[in-house]
């Protein structure tokens, strides 16, 4: 356990150093299957927010750190950092449909955002996910991701994305993931994200 804690701390320090000058939007970056009970997960995902209306695209980093509470429930902390924007949150995911080759889950959580220059917000996150495994070690997943935000001393807005992605098992404790978030309204920005998730197996 001490070794696991040291690895987690090292990963957290690396993430902090990597994004110290970058300021995020949440990413899905997991299939409908929850983290195995008792296992820890650390995922780090370089992410690009695609520019809109001729604007420049922006690179940043997203991360997820989670724990499998039961065979069907996990909890994950989330963070993301882009220029001028920092995002921190957490959610609980429930794996409610376990089929032979089809799974579905739902997640509910919340977040806060810190915008440089004002406009800080907080909100509720909701996601619905489904996944299937066409071949060994490869999962195809898709999700609907919604965020309902309230701006401090301001109004409300909603972020909405359809998210197709892949999760490939490199080894028992390492997954490669890639996804695209397709914006569904004017408040949202489409994004692309890719990275690795490491599992600290119990």
Sequence positions of predicted segments:
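A short, polar/proline- and glycine-enriched secondary-structure boundary/capping micro-motif
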Residues: 86-90, 187-190
């Amino acid at each position: 356990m001490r070794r696991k804690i040291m690895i987690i701390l090292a990963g957290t320090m690396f993430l902090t150093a990597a994004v110290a000058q970058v300021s995020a939007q949440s990413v899905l970056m997991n299939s409908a299957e929850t983290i195995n009970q008792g296992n820890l997960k650390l995922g780090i995902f370089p992410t690009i927010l695609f520019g809109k209306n001729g604007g420049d695209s922006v690179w940043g980093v997203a991360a997820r750190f989670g724990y499998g509470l039961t065979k069907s429930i996990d909890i994950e902390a989330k963070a993301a950092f882009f220029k001028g924007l920092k995002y921190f949150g957490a959610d609980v995911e429930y794996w409610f449909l376990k089929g032979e080759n089809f799974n579905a889950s739902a997640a509910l959580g919340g977040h806060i955002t810190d915008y440089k220059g004002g406009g800080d917000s907080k909100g509720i996150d909701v996601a619905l996910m489904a996944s299937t495994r066409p071949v060994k070690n490869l999962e195809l997943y898709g999700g609907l991701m919604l965020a309902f935000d309230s701006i401090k001393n301001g109004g409300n807005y909603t972020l909405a994305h359809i998210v197709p992605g892949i999760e490939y098992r490199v080894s028992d404790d390492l997954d490669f993931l890639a996804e695209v978030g397709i914006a569904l309204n004017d408040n949202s920005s489409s994004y692309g994200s890719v990275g690795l998730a490491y599992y600290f197996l119990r």
